[in-house]
């Protein structure tokens, strides 16, 4: 039996009637109703968290539409940073679940031949000097089990009585300015309206056509990823794996390791329950004649192909080669890391349709912030709508959506640029110098300005200034960016041009990105 990377489950498992809801002891204090009806499209983490935070802020979430026929779980990990986890302090059940399922892991950085560069260590936000600041919020583990985290969100959505309707693929978004409504048309011809429609249905969302007139063109980031996950008991059948990690697994210790070679890196997660790895080669290191990377979760890659990619760089440690070689056939996905240049506008002309999460901005794994940004979006949008609609009702929704866009655009752009710095370091472009001068420099960047951010507090701090900027044209400056940074828009084409000229991305980051 093949271990599936993608698992579909019963669409009725998380229907509200099956879950206890309305228990005031376990639900957040809800803000007074704003009379704003919100329709959410997309039942991924961004859409689910948007629905929850909108409910908490007093908005009426009509329903969530999801194109899949049931909840879909992938079998690996997700990183959620403290800035996103702050919102969970309002949700007792989810806080308890995060505490129960928290899983710390030891992090190591190694050369591809196994030589230790740095470790044991952790993500920067869990360094001892910072952990005191996280009192009252869930522990920001180096990772969350993606399936468990997703199921937690689905359960909470059910508890507050919000229904997810599956098998609802949205083919068109539209504005009805006369009626002051946004709307969607599904592939079944069903038309639905709401005061505000949140497009959280990932990249190539049809909301692009309404907001920008076309989908944002995909550009290669210059990288792709071979990705898989499988039970640890299967990995332990490999003698080399068992010899290296068997004792730690038996003691319940989890490892998160980065193996760094010229032109490629391998991220490896090992826990007592499952093993996951992602090999990220630059396109020039792909095996000629191998499977082209496509945006599909169909696991159709032979481990032999991945081994050939590894062999493009000599001296990989035998334990990594053995792990890849013995991965089960039909369990590896080859996913292209495509880039979509960030658009400034995330709202429709009327402001009644707004994008969130991957629908608004793409990310690559090296940012380790895609999930964090998606949840920050949700918290920010719901809070902006709270302020814009508390007195104006649904009429205030467009302004709230535009202020959300203003508060998020520059921050997201900075996080996106940081992902190229991480990818550059992990792929060994300056590894030798880094090892000699400062091993800490190879550490994946998870900077202070990113993880110290409180998206909800930021809305209440900046809303008045943002309002004046949009309505009266006064100056406005975001402060959720690297200190001292002067923001300028950028494109993937510019990044590639600079890299081709021999420049390092890290060298042209002004301000404090630490």
Curated annotation (Swiss-Prot):
Upregulation: Expression correlates with the formation of the sclerotia and thus the pigment production and is directly regulated by the cluster-specific activator CPUR_05433.
EC number: 1.-.-.-
Residues bound to FAD: 79, 146, 358, 371
Residues of the active site: 227
Pfam family name, one: FAD_binding_3
Keyword Disulfide bond among UniProt keywords: no
Pathway: Pigment biosynthesis
Cofactor: FAD
Recorded superkingdom: Eukaryota
Coiled coil: none
Record flagged with keyword Flavoprotein: yes
UniProt entry keywords in alphabetical sequence: FAD, Flavoprotein, Monooxygenase, Oxidoreductase
GO molecular function terms listed in the Swiss-Prot or TrEMBL record: FAD binding; monooxygenase activity
InterPro entries: FAD-bd, FAD-dep_Monooxygenase_BioMet, FAD/NAD-bd_sf
Family: Belongs to the paxM FAD-dependent monooxygenase family.
Function summary: FAD-dependent monooxygenase; part of the ergochrome gene cluster responsible for the typical purple-black color of the ergot sclerotia. The ergochrome gene cluster produces several ergot pigments including the yellow ergochrome secalonic acid and its derivatives, as well as the red anthraquinones endocrocin and clavorubin. The pathway begins with the synthesis of atrochrysone thioester by the polyketide synthase (PKS) CPUR_05437. The atrochrysone carboxyl ACP thioesterase CPUR_05436 then breaks the thioester bond and releases the atrochrysone carboxylic acid from CPUR_05437.
Protein name in the entry: FAD-dependent monooxygenase CPUR_05423
Origin species: Claviceps purpurea (strain 20.1)
